[in-house]
């Protein structure tokens, strides 16, 4: 074997072969097509060495086993037949591993995902570490695919069909103890003894196949299987709304393997993989994956980042508490919270405690780790402990004079290099920095709620913000586990600007008599996780509508909302889920009761509530306004690229990922079709639908947003 091989064979003195996996020049092990020859050469040596007692596959990387297959391989396939051949080659390689005459053990530390888990499943036994970095799963569905190297066939036979369906249909990842309980691994050990434990397991004679739990055995029988698959199909269809063809194919392939045997199952798996690889949904989902990977590598500016050793936070409310948690518990940075009273500080501390305690209860971390992370967060009602903070995040009320005061106080009480980052959602960063002594160190850092769940942040430099300030802020966002996009300092920034007309139109249709549930269902059918009216309830009607006057003042009537309707709702003390009354009614806190539309909402706004528009018409009216505004943002350079615009919409507001984001979706529709549709809607509903200049120009020139070699492989 050459020194550049990703798979290195070493035979120990005790006649156990250790195959170390180490992809040269990469931080993470991924499976590439060219590795097949390397693996086959090693398997040949193993078969020929009659003295061997066993084989151990183990990673030489610090914190990952195999994170999956290199997705770029799929992009090189010209048709379904080529992708199917790729899957069959993977299946054959895994079959050769499984057919080895001696015990084969996968020793797993870190991420074992996709093709990595399929390789581990081909081994006779699996053993993993108890480290928090160790996760096992088959996430191919998130790319519009299914596991193509035998995963759909081996996993159900190992852990049972219901557990396998749960893992493969949603790409669920199991931690070490969960994997042990499910029967996915045979043992969990500390990392320090992983190799020796795997070697000892390899020396044993092959153990009998694990007996599945009674429930799984019943479900594997003809009657149980028929009932299970009928229920799973129904539940999956309700969840995906038919927008994700991979889920239906996953169910088909697993059922085929169980009903007709593994040979038929492998054949069905390969064919389905090939067909899914060519679907527009998979191409779009892969594009989102590549774009998000690129964004995470983007430093934000050409300047090197400044020091980032500790962070301050002003305000211990909902946002401040969430920001403190991601900074300390994900970023590992010491955090000092300042609030005007101890109640605010205690709220922020409890916020982190609750999240960490949930992890302890679920056995994701130990109590000692919880205490260690919580110790990174401290608080004060003054600026003690702030003098050495490298960056201070302001999360106080949306009040310009107050935020300007915060800038002055930070400049007075912190170091000369300290960056001031405002979490404002609507106020111009330039205005916040207007009186600053060091305006080059003032920037916007807009988080989305709930902070611990939403992956996106907007980084907003104003005209005088330095390149180093941008780079340092982007670096912080990445440490917090966020995906940052840099956007211009214009009203609404990017995400709220494209979201506002979408929600406004939903409210406008409500005033025309359309029913709440019909509007929401139409946009869920289109592919959004929740409908626009439910989203407004979730965000808070008072909070969600606060930005509308700002946008209307900046951009004119196209941002005007039915003001009398919003006022009537707010005057009736309807804030949404947070006070149990919005467009929907909510049960008592903690109850699982299904939310219901409050029929009083129709009387409140003076309509009958009888839907006349089709679901397609409802979705078109909302989505077209969002797309038109996104194109304006591109034209005005609010976003730096179509890539950032797509990621911002998918990660910030749940734009359907199977469409690739608003810009890929507009490219798919074509600029000519976009302009024609907007003109038709403008004739029906008014000038707010007038196509923007950017789209008109692109239609005339037959241009697209994704150009200059930007492909679904992120080149």
UniProtKB/Swiss-Prot annotation:
InterPro entries recorded: 3-OHacyl-CoA_DH_CS, 3-OHacyl-CoA_DH_NAD-bd, 3HC_DH_C, 6-PGluconate_DH-like_C_sf, ClpP/crotonase-like_dom_sf, Enoyl-CoA_hydra/iso, FA_oxidation_alpha_subunit, FadJ
Record region (Enoyl-CoA hydratase): 1-190
GO cellular component: cytoplasm
Function summary: Catalyzes the formation of a hydroxyacyl-CoA by addition of water on enoyl-CoA. Also exhibits 3-hydroxyacyl-CoA epimerase and 3-hydroxyacyl-CoA dehydrogenase activities.
Region (3-hydroxyacyl-CoA dehydrogenase): 306-715
Record-given protein name: Fatty acid oxidation complex subunit alpha
Chain positions of site Important for catalytic activity: 118, 140
SUPFAM superfamilies: 6-phosphogluconate dehydrogenase C-terminal domain-like, ClpP/crotonase, NAD(P)-binding Rossmann-fold domains
Subcellular location: Cytoplasm
Pfam families the UniProt entry points to: 3HCDH (PF00725), 3HCDH_N (PF02737), ECH_1 (PF00378)
GO molecular function, one term: NAD+ binding
Subunit structure: Heterotetramer of two alpha chains (FadJ) and two beta chains (FadI).
């Amino acid at each position: 074997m050459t020194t550049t091989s990703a798979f290195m064979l070493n035979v120990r003195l005790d006649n156990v072969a250790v195959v170390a996996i180490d992809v040269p020049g990469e931080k993470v092990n991924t499976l590439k097509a060219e590795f097949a020859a390397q693996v086959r050469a090693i398997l040949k040596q193993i078969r020929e060495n009659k003295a061997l007692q066993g084989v151990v596959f183990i990673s030489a990387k610090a914190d990952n086993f195999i994170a999956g297959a290199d997705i770029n391989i799929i992009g090189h396939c010209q048709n379904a037949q080529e992708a199917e051949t790729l899957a069959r080659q993977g299946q054959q390689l895994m079959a050769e591993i499984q057919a080895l005459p001696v015990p084969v053990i996968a020793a797993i530390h870190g991420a074992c995902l996709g093709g990595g888990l399929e390789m581990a499943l081909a081994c006779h036994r699996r053993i993993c570490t108890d480290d928090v970095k160790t996760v096992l799963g088959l996430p191919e569905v998130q790319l519009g695919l299914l596991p193509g190297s035998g995963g759909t066939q081996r996993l159900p036979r190992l852990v049972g069909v219901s557990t396998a369906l749960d893992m493969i249909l949603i790409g669920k990842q199991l931690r070490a103890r969960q994997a042990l309980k499910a029967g996915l691994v045979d043992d969990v050990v500390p990392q320090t003894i992983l190799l020796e434990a795997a070697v000892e397991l390899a020396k044993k004679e092959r153990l009998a196949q694990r007996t599945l739990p009674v429930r799984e055995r019943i479900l594997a029988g003809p009657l149980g299987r028929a009932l299970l698959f009928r229920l799973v199909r129904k539940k999956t269809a309700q969840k995906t709304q038919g927008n994700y063809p991979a889920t239906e194919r996953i169910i088909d392939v697993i059922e085929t393997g169980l009903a007709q045997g593994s040979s038929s199952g492998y054949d069905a798996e390969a064919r389905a993989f090939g067909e899914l690889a060519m679907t527009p949904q998979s191409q779009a989902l892969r594009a989102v994956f590549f774009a998000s990977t690129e964004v995470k590598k983007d430093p934000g500016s050409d300047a090197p980042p400044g020091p980032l050793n500790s962070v301050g936070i002003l305000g211990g409310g909902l946002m401040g508490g969430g920001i403190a948690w991601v900074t300390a518990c994900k970023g590992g940075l010491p955090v000092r919270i300042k609030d005007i009273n101890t109640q605010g500080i205690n709220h922020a501390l409890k916020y982190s405690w609750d999240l960490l305690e949930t992890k302890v209860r679920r056995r994701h971390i130990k109590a000692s780790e919880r205490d260690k992370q919580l110790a990174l967060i401290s608080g004060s009602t003054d600026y003690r402990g702030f003098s050495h903070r490298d960056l201070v995040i302001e999360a106080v009320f949306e009040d310009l004079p107050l935020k300007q005061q915060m800038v002055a106080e930070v400049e007075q009480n912190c170091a000369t290099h300290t960056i001031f980052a405002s979490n404002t959602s609507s106020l111009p960063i330039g205005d916040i920095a207007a009186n600053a002594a060091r305006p080059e160190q003032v920037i916007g850092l807009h988080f989305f709620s709930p902070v611990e769940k939403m992956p996106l942040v907007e980084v907003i430099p104003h005209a005088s913000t330095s390149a180093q300030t941008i780079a340092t802020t982007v670096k912080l966002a990445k440490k917090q586990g966020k995906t940052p996009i840099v956007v211009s300092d214009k009203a609404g920034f990017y995400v709220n600007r494209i979201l506002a007309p979408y929600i406004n139109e939903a409210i406008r249709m409500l005033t025309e008599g359309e029913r709440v549930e019909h509007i929401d269902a139409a946009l869920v059918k289109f592919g959004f996780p929740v409908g626009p009216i439910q989203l407004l309830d979730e965000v808070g009607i008072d909070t969600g509508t606060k930005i509308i006057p700002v946008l209307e003042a900046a951009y004119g009537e196209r941002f005007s909302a039915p003001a009398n309707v919003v006022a009537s709702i707010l005057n009736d003390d309807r804030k949404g889920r947070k006070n149990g009354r919005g467009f929907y009614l909510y049960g008592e806190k903690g109850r699982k009761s299904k939310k219901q539309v409050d029929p009083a909402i129709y009387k409140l706004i003076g309509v009958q509530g009888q839907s006349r528009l089709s679901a397609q018409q409802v979705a078109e009216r909302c989505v077209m306004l969002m797309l038109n505004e996104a194109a304006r943002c591109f034209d005005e350079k609010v976003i730096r690229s179509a890539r950032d615009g797509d990621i911002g919409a998918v990660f910030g507001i749940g734009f359907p990922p199977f469409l690739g984001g608003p810009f890929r979706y507009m490219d798919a529709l074509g600029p000519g079709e976009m302009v024609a549709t907007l003109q038709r809607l403008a004739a029906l509903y008014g000038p707010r639908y007038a196509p923007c200049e950017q789209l008109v120009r692109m239609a005339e020139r037959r241009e697209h947003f994704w150009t200059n070699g930007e492909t679904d492989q992120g080149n």
